[in-house]
């Protein structure tokens, strides 16, 4: 018999109120000592596996046969939320019609939040003039080249 993988229940930033619930994610062995309740993590979310920020609410083990996505990375060296703050966020969701993540967002300092952005660069040795010609009049493709 194999041990069940360690999991974390995570409130994700991308969830709306109607689908706001803790989502289960597998904890990779490399992150096992870093994933604790109250830390912020980056996880794949939705059908397109878009990376989004989440907050670990609790830890557990997976039921046999469950297919889970894995936590991509941990953003904090130590928890930014205490157990009391996590309970408060869950209570705020029920009382004030907001997501757990929105409640957490309101409790923590503004400079703490993580924002992802896509950065594109040309490969080394790529001819810039032929790239401009291939891009044509597309404003987005021209923006990537500039």
Q: What spans do the regions from the language model cover?
A:
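Accessory, non-ATPase domains that flank or precede helicase/AAA+ motor cores in DNA-metabolism machines
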Residues: 1-146
């Amino acid at each position: 018999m194999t041990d069940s993988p360690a999991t974390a229940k995570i409130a994700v930033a991308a969830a709306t109120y109607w689908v706001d619930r803790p989502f289960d994610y597998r904890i990779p062995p490399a992150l096992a000592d870093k994933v604790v309740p109250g830390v912020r993590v980056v996880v794949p979310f939705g059908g397109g596996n878009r990376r989004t920020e989440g907050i670990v609410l609790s830890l557990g083990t997976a039921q046999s046969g469950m297919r889970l996505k894995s936590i991509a990375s941990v953003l904090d060296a130590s928890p930014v939320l205490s157990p009391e703050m996590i309970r408060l966020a869950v209570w705020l969701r029920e009382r004030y019609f907001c997501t757990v993540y929105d409640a957490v967002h309101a409790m923590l300092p503004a400079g703490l939040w993580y924002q992802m952005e896509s950065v594109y660069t040309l490969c080394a040795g790529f001819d810039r003039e032929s790239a401009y010609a291939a891009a044509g009049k597309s404003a987005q493709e021209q923006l990537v080249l500039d």
